[in-house]
Amino acid sequence: MQELEKAVPSSVRVTRQSENLVILEKDLATEQMVLAMGPQHPSTHGVLKLECLTDGEVVTEAEPVLGYLHRCFEKTAENVDYPAVVPFTDRLDYLAAMNSEFAYALTVEKLLDIEIPRRVEFIRILVAELNRIASHLVAIGTYGIDLGAFTPFLFCFRDREIILGLLEWASGARMLYNYVWVGGLAYDVPADFLKRIREFCAYFRPKAKELADLLTSNEIFVKRTHGIGIMPADVAINYGWSGPMLRGSGVEWDLRRNDPYSLYSELDFNVCVPDGKHSVIGDCLSRHLVRAYEMEESLNIIEQCIDKMPSSDGFNSRAAIPKKIRPKAGEVYGRAENPRGELGFYIQSDGKSTKPLRCKARSSCFVNLSAMKDLSKGQLIPDLVAIIGSIDIVLGEVDR
């Protein structure tokens, strides 16, 4: 054995385990391997591909590969009239289409400098918050499936069906609504709609707490998310994060509160940020908790909208604007707090055409996903699933 050790080059470390077993460090070294995850992998929530560089089970680098769902949204928007862009915004974040319509309508109305009826504003906020709850239910339910918990998915989608039924009653569609138009709404809500919404709030309020506890009281779920994919607040800000992702890192930033649009300044609600008691601030569990507790705040906003909403007597669902819109020459940026963060639209008008000269969409999903390299570095391969699920991406908005 001693003769064998003498024959080993000095550059190779020798570890003596016993008289008969000598382990050379060179034999234990591993080579880095490229692992392709997706674009058909079920945990990527769409056609996302991750090219991962791994050292054994540890991820050293993960690079998102995008473009599989690119649909030329911006170029399409520049070739149709301003109001005709609304149905295309539905197909960005198709799980929160009402919020996408809202953001676009706000931007064009800012360019037109027009005033919207108060009843329209409250209805817009109401349906947007309903859609926010439905979106968070998808995020929570599918996150449970990603990590092996099937029961929460069933409960989440049971309650989401109720919301989709209410939105279908108001707009005529379950997911792609085309309801929030430039200047107002497609039409007023049905006669008993607000009564049904209030009944839903009373029903869902205890359910929201139950759904939040269903996963956070699950020991396996907590171990899979606690301390995984930590993003410090300063790094999150530098990346341009927003929404539950930024709030999950402990930053109390919500456009509805910090830069109010529509009538949010008249509404009272809390901005949900983790307190660090149940999670490491900035980890996957923190981001999940933000979404879970935001649903109750959305219920508070909805009930306030119903209380403050003016009567429908003599109500016109649209402001007095011409059928063909020709905004004055200029540019404008409008933004709104979508379920996944800030969705913004930059629109440029030449003052002559009925079509935007330039229409740029700022996607929160794209920005949040861009931090995948930092989030995944040093994590285990199975933890990539937990990290992707915590980002809650919609590839329709990422690729546009």
UniProtKB/Swiss-Prot annotation:
It is found in: Cell inner membrane. NDH-1 is composed of 14 different subunits. Subunits NuoB, C, D, E, F, and G constitute the peripheral sector of the complex. Its EC number is 7.1.1.-. Gene3D superfamilies: Cytochrome-c3 Hydrogenase, chain B. It catalyses: a quinone + NADH + 5 H(+)(in) = a quinol + NAD(+) + 4 H(+)(out). Belongs to the complex I 49 kDa subunit family. Its main location: membrane. Keywords: Cell inner membrane, Cell membrane, Membrane, NAD, Quinone, Translocase, Transport. The gene is nuoD. It is a peripheral membrane protein. This is NADH-quinone oxidoreductase subunit D. The keyword Ion transport does not apply. It comes from the Bacteria. GO terms for molecular function: NAD binding; NADH:ubiquinone reductase (non-electrogenic) activity; quinone binding. GO terms for cellular component: plasma membrane. NDH-1 shuttles electrons from NADH, via FMN and iron-sulfur (Fe-S) centers, to quinones in the respiratory chain. The immediate electron acceptor for the enzyme in this species is believed to be a menaquinone. Couples the redox reaction to proton translocation (for every two electrons transferred, four hydrogen ions are translocated across the cytoplasmic membrane), and thus conserves the redox energy in a proton gradient. It holds the Pfam family Complex1_49kDa.
